[in-house]
């Protein structure tokens, strides 16, 4: 796909992956409209950290996915939609599950309907590897069963199925990308790698939840390239595409690796309040990299 001059809407643009995607699209000379959630501070989230020359080339619009009028206005005259906006954070989904359904399912429905009525070249919907639950087999391919092991995962499964239904029912050119765990600059301090690094540098020990879960970790710029390749590939329409490396590491191994790189002999301790409920824990997520992604290039490295 030729991105120069392409009119692109990015929801969730003020978030971690979204801000990197916006930055990359600007570098490719796309005409980027960034949807951010309204706040009284006129704060663009992580877009505020982009270079000034990049920010000057972004059209920022404030709105709310749960308002259908807001999604309609945001999508006007756009060719491509990258839908990344969602309520994330598994712990809070145990506290406010209805809010997760309202935003992740209801908000996605509003955007899909606006895209259907206005017509877009491509709608890239963002899922999550959490929809797989604990792996029934590894590596996990796109046909792996989906399991709602948390209200967050359940809300994303619902959103994924809505996206699928709009492809099958209305021929909306949807592709669903399912990133595994992504890391890199601008990531939330609550994420596992920043959490370990911060404690390794400042604490007397490194306190974590369970050390056993294994995750497939992908650098954020690679994840962004996966988004762009999925949007550009016609064979990806109607498909779910995993974005992962095919390698996993346990949280304990990850902490030991970071401590070795930083230096020091700090103890790694587990704290129960950091753990998920046992039946809600996802013990292993490791992506298959030889599935449908081969037809359109997959991750760059």
Predicted segment positions?
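N-terminal Rossmann-like NAD(P)+-binding domain of SDR-like oxidoreductases, especially those catalyzing
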Residues: 1-182
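C-terminal substrate-binding subdomain of Rossmann-fold SDR/epimerase-dehydratase oxidoreductases
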Residues: 23-30, 34, 63, 194, ...
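Short aromatic-enriched loop/helix-cap "lid" or pocket-rim segments at secondary-structure transitions
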Residues: 37, 44-47, 136-138, 187-190, ...
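Residue-level signature of the cytosolic catalytic core of signaling kinases
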Residues: 54, 136, 185-189, 247, ...
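Residues in well-ordered alpha-helical elements
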Residues: 69-72, 91, 98, 109, ...
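Heptad-repeat alpha-helical coiled-coil signaling segments
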Residues: 110, 181, 187, 213-215
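Hydrophobic alpha-helix immediately C-terminal to the catalytic Tyr-X-X-X-Lys motif of short-chain
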Residues: 158, 162, 166, 196, ...
């Amino acid at each position: 796909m030729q991105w120069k001059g392409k009119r692109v809407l990015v929801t969730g643009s003020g978030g971690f992956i979204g801000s990197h995607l916006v930055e990359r699209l600007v570098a490719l000379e796309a005409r980027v409209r960034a949807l951010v959630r309204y706040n009284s501070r006129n704060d663009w989230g992580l877009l505020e950290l982009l270079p000034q020359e990049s920010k000057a080339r972004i059209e920022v619009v404030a709105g709310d996915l749960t308002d259908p009028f807001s999604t309609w206005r945001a999508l006007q005259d756009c060719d491509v939609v990258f839908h990344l906006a969602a309520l994330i954070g598994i712990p809070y989904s145990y506290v406010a599950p209805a809010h997760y359904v309202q935003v992740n399912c209801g908000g996605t429905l509003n955007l899909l309907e606006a895209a259907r009525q206005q017509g877009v070249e491509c709608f890239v919907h963002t899922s999550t590897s959490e929809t797989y639950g604990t792996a029934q087999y590894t590596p996990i391919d796109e046909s792996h069963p989906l399991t709602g092991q948390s209200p967050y995962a359940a809300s994303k499964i619902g959103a994924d199925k809505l996206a699928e239904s709009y492809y099958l029912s209305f021929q909306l050119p949807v592709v669903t990308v399912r990133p595994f765990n992504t890391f890199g600059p601008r990531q939330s301090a609550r994420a596992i790698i920043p959490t370990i690094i911060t404690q390794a540098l400042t604490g007397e020990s490194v306190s974590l939840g369970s050390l056993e879960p294994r995750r497939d970790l992908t650098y954020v710029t690679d994840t962004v390239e996966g988004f762009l390749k999925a949007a550009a590939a016609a064979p990806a329409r109607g498909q779910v595409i995993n974005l992962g490396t095919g390698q996993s590491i346990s949280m304990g191994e990850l902490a030991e690796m970071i401590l070795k790189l930083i230096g020091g002999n700090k103890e790694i301790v587990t704290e129960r309040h950091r753990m998920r409920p046992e039946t809600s824990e996802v013990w292993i997520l490791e992506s298959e990299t030889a599935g449908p992604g081969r037809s359109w290039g997959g991750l760059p490295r």
